[in-house]
Amino acid sequence: MARNIKVEELLQTPIEKQRIELVERKGIGHPDSISDGLAEAVSRALCREYISKCGTVLHHNTDETQIVAGRSSPKFGGGEVLQPIYMLLVGRATKEFEGVELATESVALQAARNYLRKTMVNMDLERDVIMDCKLGTGSSDLRDVFKRDRVPVANDTSFGVGHAPFSELENIVYNTERRLLTDLKSRMPAIGEDMKVMGLRDGEDIALTICSGMIGKYIDDLDSYINMTQEMKIYVEELATHYTERDVNVYINTGDNLKTSCVFLTVTGTSAEMGDDGSVGRGNRCNGLITPNRPMSMEATSGKNPINHIGKIYNLLSTQMARDIVKQVPEVQDVYIRLLSQIAKPIDQPLVASAQIIPKEGTSFEKVKSEAEVVIDDWLSNVTKITEMVIRGELNTF
Amino acid sequence: MARNIKVEELLQTPIEKQRIELVERKGIGHPDSISDGLAEAVSRALCREYISKCGTVLHHNTDETQIVAGRSSPKFGGGEVLQPIYMLLVGRATKEFEGVELATESVALQAARNYLRKTMVNMDLERDVIMDCKLGTGSSDLRDVFKRDRVPVANDTSFGVGHAPFSELENIVYNTERRLLTDLKSRMPAIGEDMKVMGLRDGEDIALTICSGMIGKYIDDLDSYINMTQEMKIYVEELATHYTERDVNVYINTGDNLKTSCVFLTVTGTSAEMGDDGSVGRGNRCNGLITPNRPMSMEATSGKNPINHIGKIYNLLSTQMARDIVKQVPEVQDVYIRLLSQIAKPIDQPLVASAQIIPKEGTSFEKVKSEAEVVIDDWLSNVTKITEMVIRGELNTF
Amino acid sequence: MARNIKVEELLQTPIEKQRIELVERKGIGHPDSISDGLAEAVSRALCREYISKCGTVLHHNTDETQIVAGRSSPKFGGGEVLQPIYMLLVGRATKEFEGVELATESVALQAARNYLRKTMVNMDLERDVIMDCKLGTGSSDLRDVFKRDRVPVANDTSFGVGHAPFSELENIVYNTERRLLTDLKSRMPAIGEDMKVMGLRDGEDIALTICSGMIGKYIDDLDSYINMTQEMKIYVEELATHYTERDVNVYINTGDNLKTSCVFLTVTGTSAEMGDDGSVGRGNRCNGLITPNRPMSMEATSGKNPINHIGKIYNLLSTQMARDIVKQVPEVQDVYIRLLSQIAKPIDQPLVASAQIIPKEGTSFEKVKSEAEVVIDDWLSNVTKITEMVIRGELNTF
Amino acid sequence: MARNIKVEELLQTPIEKQRIELVERKGIGHPDSISDGLAEAVSRALCREYISKCGTVLHHNTDETQIVAGRSSPKFGGGEVLQPIYMLLVGRATKEFEGVELATESVALQAARNYLRKTMVNMDLERDVIMDCKLGTGSSDLRDVFKRDRVPVANDTSFGVGHAPFSELENIVYNTERRLLTDLKSRMPAIGEDMKVMGLRDGEDIALTICSGMIGKYIDDLDSYINMTQEMKIYVEELATHYTERDVNVYINTGDNLKTSCVFLTVTGTSAEMGDDGSVGRGNRCNGLITPNRPMSMEATSGKNPINHIGKIYNLLSTQMARDIVKQVPEVQDVYIRLLSQIAKPIDQPLVASAQIIPKEGTSFEKVKSEAEVVIDDWLSNVTKITEMVIRGELNTF
């Protein structure tokens, strides 16, 4: 059956030429990101458990972790968590299959604790965290849906959106958090995983406001703190030059009051230890960013089952489509994908697959159009590839 | 101090002329909307309690309700909830003020139960719901921030977005849910508050897919069910003619299987009774819609304190600004507002207040620009009016 | 099959002649008693639900309610609960029977809330209490056990104990709480349901220490409070004369400090509102008392299923046996019953039914022995009568 | 001030001469014992934390752990926990002292997890357990009470009871559990910590019914299981000969059905993994036993603060007194101690310290009386020694 693919030319100021652009990324230790990470870790663990015990992924959605902040008393050279952070894993999972009972809650709990241990390296799981779990069973037996001999049908009437390529600012914001945590942190362990990078481009001026929960035990005193944030600033300024020729100003922890030594210190690297709650789906979209100048979906990508949940698959898929179109069709300036499902229809047959394309100046939209259609159609023909990539952990969801 | 207001002309296909447009609204009984509603009801109740006991609103944010679905056994003519829906109110609140202890948790609990009783009229609060509450104290004493003799300073570096006017599709989607619940429901009590209206405009064709959890006890049998959904369809089709001349097709509960009598029935009017979890900030934006063709903010508006939380105030404010610009500047076709705060700066002095305007064909952007600037500047001068409107319950947040 | 009934003469100073006797009763509003009451109310409601839906009582045990105290700010003439009391219903219940799903959690929740509303008349269930529920399924399907065509088999190797008659002090302590709450409270609503009556008999002197959480809203001021406790004292002194000719001294709220107005006030009538946690099985035994001069069982009677749970049935049964022996065999001074079950054996065939009897002076033990055996044997032959009395609510469990 | 010590002669059949005697011990892995152990571990950790941070023990009571059973699928050679056991630590603790905030919840959580890891060696804390914690603050600031320059005053009007010496049956029951777990288990790791030893002496015949949750992964098959329980039986029979010359019959897991291979297997060593809930204070008294032929107190000893909580101190103290009297006064056959406090009076001045003594045949009660009084008075003079022993972990509480 032919797919309903609609590629149209978008008449719009391309993002780089718009006057104001806003981009945000929450670091992996932000309470909302921790929630996303836990939700996705649990879903992946369930997928593996289901495959191992039942030969196929069974119905589940674990996209609702709630984090209730603790209390802490951070200090230079030490500090402690006073009241543990409470983390509640929430969702649905199939608990029985052909007479076999499945250890869904235990698997979820273990996966969550493992994820946290790997991600939040300064969190003491024995005393800083209460990990709770409420997994219900689903609304019905979707076993048939999950059979792999045909394309699954959509769980809902819902949509996903994606765009490409990243703007300069998007690249800077994304990589600032990534490089601070994967590169600079290796020699400056005081950098906390809870980070918020807010980028504002006003014409040709870029301002990066970084809020980073520094880890007290690695910092001797205020001087040391000032030196570190200064080094971070220089690091980010240098990093930005790889992505832009615009002026970039970097501001770190602007809420600090150095006179009163009231600075952004943490014990564990996340503000969830002290007053900041978190939940799934309220932070980064699946491309790793929050981009109010771009179309976005409200659907949480993390934690949903990767078999038939449109809120996950179509967000990931549209992002892959957009990136491939940009890669394979050089005349594309900006592309926006929107995929809309209809409940109970095969997921390779969306109600509409819409692409809006801004061609580069001087290029023909018609050529672009047909090439983009091919990319979209190919991806839809291979939609279950997204499922496999998710299970293998090859696609980020936040 | 002069404000940093940037009004630019946006070169873009106006929304009504884009080929594909998607708009969604989750009804007030959708698990995500219930979460939003509870969060906001709690915040309003705390505001009133603080004013009554302390003369001023104190620091709080209660924007993190988590709903864990129950289990139910719906039936024509009856049905019952088997396992109660678990609702966890989460957030921060000031519990002591000048030596007086405040009943924050009790106030929150009562407000939440009252809200639910009023909103979900078929839910039996004695047996269908477990209402739990975990309110911590905040990260620091923000009392100074909340003094009313000067403009509060921003709690965070964050942004809000808004647009106006509503497109035809936006109007249809929004009013479909509103009128079904406020008008048709008065004579057809079987309509559940949990509704999802998904609108797709493909050129001149509009498809409305409505998913509505019907309430079993008001429906005798399958025939009766079919008659009711048919009546709803006719009602919505007629309603749509008030907003558009385009073709409108309405689809209700397309997931139903009439042969097996497997239809979307509920006991209480919400799918939270059976398998659908919910949380704050994952549904409608503060204008009541999810609009992937429009800029959106990821910030949850519901439950945040209305004094200095940018994630609430700037989303509400930018929407008001956009609506007033459209009202006062007739040459404006579409306007998009983005307000970006800087932590610890007065909220009437955003880092940038950006407006992107598509003028109507044949009008002068320059005239529009200056008039829009006046509207924006006026609103910023009167920013605390938003606070007052929130406390009085005059602004919806979802 | 002949039953293993062992009646022996006990050579022991009868209770009334022992020098020191201690007796305690916790009022129905004591946090431990509330837990007991909730547990039993839930079990009764489940019994009724099972009978109504399945024709027979199914396996359940709900004997583990946990109460976590709230915070309150009591005052003369008013006061309020600041943080709700958290009550967690815990236990096991059969959730499915021959394909029918049963509303166990909803039934439990409703029963608990109803019980609380009736028992704690000054508690506002909308804001003073969070009622939570965690009912698992049992360790195995005990359906066969619950068939009514034969005597059920014991769920465990366990025992129950009972004695009769009540001593003077036991009568006084028991009736003090009962009459204060059922009689005096009707004209003095300030008496809280949370009461602890501690009786000490030292030879011929009886001291009753009563700790009673008075309800602030019914008391204007300290003078009024003093008058009320004085009236209570007089009331109890008069009451005691119905049971003893010994000297009785009554002390009420001896922890009060009248100079600092630091007295035992509550908002709701129970100290669970402020600092006193509670759980099942830690207060009164099933005869309503705690009696360290008498044999006791550690088994919680409340909340266990009345079909085959020895910890419930044998405690109730041995108390009934003891009372009937005293009633029917006038030569008995004191009798102590101990019933020991063996797991998986019919409950009318205890491993041993032991009676220790102190005959009245000058009477023949042999006559007493055979008459007591008959009472015991009769009760064992009609053991399921206990089950029926429990379900009908005719037997107290605390 | 002279103390109110009352030593009386008890005319009573000594325990060894009573016809029927019942004694029970719950093993350290029984759900009720785990609750006791967690509660006491938390209290000890808080004592140490308070001393380390504040120089003195501050007010706390953590005597209310609630265990909600999980689900498991035990097997010979393996098995797994399907749903984690939920453990809720409940109590009160001082969270602030002279401006210093104390990490009470974190300390509690860590202590609980450590205790569990050491006690339940086959429990995987990463996936088998959810450890939750709700510690409130107390009803008032008892700091003054806790000053060490004078004897603390009683927190309540309450009592403790103790007796000595152990009867033969008490010794057998107590040591059966102890030796199985500390000696035989070292070469038979399949013995689970969840054990219930029920002893019945009927005249000269002793029956020990042992219910022991065997650990599947150490047992190959049913034959192996049968061999092990047989070896346990022989071990206990031999052990009993050290304490009695009476006939002892040992029954292990009499609920097993060998034909259907339905035997008492566990994954973790405790039935809390599958259907058995638990809570503090419902199992062993502080002497390690449940003894319905002896006076008992209902007060939970575990988890209460060891400074002024009568429910803890007087139970431990009366047991120490009884044991010392037996040791130092050889003419004592049986001694029963009851200590009754009065709220707000120094704990070395009980309202009454009652001893009931059965002297050995042919000995003078008068001599015994005065010697016993000395022991009692000495202990009361040194009552705070109990506190120190508790903090140092030298006294068991269950």
UniProtKB/Swiss-Prot annotation, chains A, B, C, D:
Binding site for ATP: G136, T137, G138, S139, S140, D141
The keyword Nucleotide-binding appears for this protein: yes
Keywords: ATP-binding, Magnesium, Nucleotide-binding, One-carbon metabolism, Transferase
InterPro entries: AdoMet_synthase_2_family, AdoMet_synthase_3, S-AdoMet_synthetase_arc
Catalysed reactions, as listed in the record: L-methionine + ATP + H2O = S-adenosyl-L-methionine + phosphate + diphosphate
EC number(s) per entry: 2.5.1.6
Pathway: Amino-acid biosynthesis; S-adenosyl-L-methionine biosynthesis; S-adenosyl-L-methionine from L-methionine: step 1/1
Gene Ontology BP terms: one-carbon metabolic process; S-adenosylmethionine biosynthetic process
Cofactor(s) for this UniProt protein: Mg(2+)
Pfam families noted in UniProt: AdoMet_Synthase
Top-level lineage group: Archaea
Entry-linked Gene3D superfamilies: 3.30.300.10, S-adenosylmethionine synthetase, C-terminal domain
The family this protein is said to belong to: Belongs to the AdoMet synthase 2 family.
Function: Catalyzes the formation of S-adenosylmethionine from methionine and ATP.
The name this protein goes by in its record: S-adenosylmethionine synthase
